[in-house]
């Protein structure tokens, strides 16, 4: 796609990342690291999921509460 000045429209040419999680789905994950705000960081098929009130090394069942383009939020269940 080109804009009205004959230049490529970068936004339309971006590669869309396949998001492997959906809001409301449940997973069993292991907390691999801790975020700056203290949330645990897990991954589902390499996709980052932030889980509050967890500790590094903990394995928990989670429910996805929000999905963004590069990460998701989940809660322990």
From Swiss-Prot:
<feature type="region of interest" description="Disordered">
    <location>
        <begin position="1"/>
        <end position="21"/>
    </location>
</feature>
<feature type="domain" description="TRAM">
    <location>
        <begin position="20"/>
        <end position="77"/>
    </location>
</feature>
<dbReference type="InterPro" id="IPR012340">
    <property type="entry name" value="NA-bd_OB-fold"/>
</dbReference>
<dbReference type="Pfam" id="PF01938">
    <property type="entry name" value="TRAM"/>
</dbReference>
<feature type="compositionally biased region" description="Basic and acidic residues">
    <location>
        <begin position="11"/>
        <end position="21"/>
    </location>
</feature>
<protein>
    <recommendedName>
        <fullName>Uncharacterized protein MJ0660</fullName>
    </recommendedName>
</protein>
<feature type="compositionally biased region" description="Basic residues">
    <location>
        <begin position="1"/>
        <end position="10"/>
    </location>
</feature>
<dbReference type="InterPro" id="IPR002792">
    <property type="entry name" value="TRAM_dom"/>
</dbReference>
């Amino acid at each position: 796609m080109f804009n009205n000045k004959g230049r490529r429209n970068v936004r339309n040419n971006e590669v869309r990342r396949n998001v492997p999680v959906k809001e409301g789905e449940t997973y069993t994950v292991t907390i691999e690291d801790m975020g700056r705000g203290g949330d645990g960081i897990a991954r589902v098929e390499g996709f980052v999921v932030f889980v509050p009130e967890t500790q590094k090394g903990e394995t928990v069942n989670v429910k996805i509460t929000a999905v963004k383009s590069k990460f998701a939020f989940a809660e322990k269940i």
